[in-house]
Amino acid sequence: MKLVFAGTPEVAVPALDALIASDRHEVAAVVTRPDAPAGRGRRLVASPVAERAQEAGIEVLKPAKPRDEEFLARLREIAPDCCPVVAYGALLPKVALDVPARGWVNLHFSLLPAWRGAAPVQHAVMAGDEVTGASTFLIEEGLDSGPVYGVLTEEVRPTDTSGDLLTRLAFAGAGLLAATMDGIEDGTLHAVPQPHEGVTLAPKITVEDAQVQWSAPALRVDRVVRGCTPAPGAWTVFRGERLKLIQATPVLDRTDLAPGELSAAKNNVYVGTGSHAVELLWVQPQGKKPMRGADWARGVRIAHGELLGP
């Protein structure tokens, strides 16, 4: 089939590579978000998908909005059979959805109808899901509500960050998306409506959402830290400045600390929660590089009974 691929971040690149490598499909063009400022100099930088497409000699379309007439005219001119999508980053209007003969097919990183929305992997980790996965589905005007073509499952490991899990799903999902394109072309794959039961939502995790509440149980603190790593980054406040929490682990035999209370030993630093303590393994003070929690604690000389939090 003739395809127009839509995607933007690094997580979409494995799927694009899988479709480029396919001997059954032609990636005629790529749609991605416009170049965005990055780095200290705030220089405009092309998206990872745009860079990969340019390396492969594929036409790149960067509409400010996917309803722009110039973009729609070019899309109609290309006349794709199908438009596979991975983390494009903009809602597609009906006028765009109607262009490809076989629609737009999204690779979504959850087992739909669970975790519909922008941050399914982060929410799966934060909720303590033991299994998640990826789904390919036909995009409709609703939020991730279209009929499903295929799914795969992936174990959520006890130490997974959302970044770890998303990386595995990106590579596994690339094969699922390519197989979905094959099945659509063959006419052997038919989308099945999502059940009405089991719908959960996964809105974008904000910086405010990522603030650790020390009154929560240790298990919840651990999940928030892992779910918000690498982005937006779990955090707390120490002496009026933000402290990023990169890695923490529950310590089941410490129940002597009040929520937010710090306790430093020679090679460890602990903080109390609503249940057990957690050990801060890696942190990043404001304006500094990541460091081991014990090294940070030695440097700041924690006072007896000193607290983390607002």
Swiss-Prot record:
(6S)-5,6,7,8-tetrahydrofolate binds at S110, L111, L112, P113. It comes from the Bacteria. Signal peptide: none annotated. It is an enzyme of class 2 (transferase). The keyword DNA-binding does not apply. Its EC number is 2.1.2.9. CDD domains: FMT_core_Met-tRNA-FMT_N, Met_tRNA_FMT_C. Keywords: Protein biosynthesis, Transferase. It catalyses: L-methionyl-tRNA(fMet) + (6R)-10-formyltetrahydrofolate = N-formyl-L-methionyl-tRNA(fMet) + (6S)-5,6,7,8-tetrahydrofolate + H(+). GO terms for cellular component: cytosol. The keyword Transferase applies. GO terms for molecular function: methionyl-tRNA formyltransferase activity. NCBIfam families: fmt (TIGR00460). Belongs to the Fmt family. Attaches a formyl group to the free amino group of methionyl-tRNA(fMet). The formyl group appears to play a dual role in the initiator identity of N-formylmethionyl-tRNA by promoting its recognition by IF2 and preventing the misappropriation of this tRNA by the elongation apparatus. This is Methionyl-tRNA formyltransferase. It comes from Streptomyces griseus subsp. griseus (strain JCM 4626 / CBS 651.72 / NBRC 13350 / KCC S-0626 / ISP 5235). The gene is fmt.
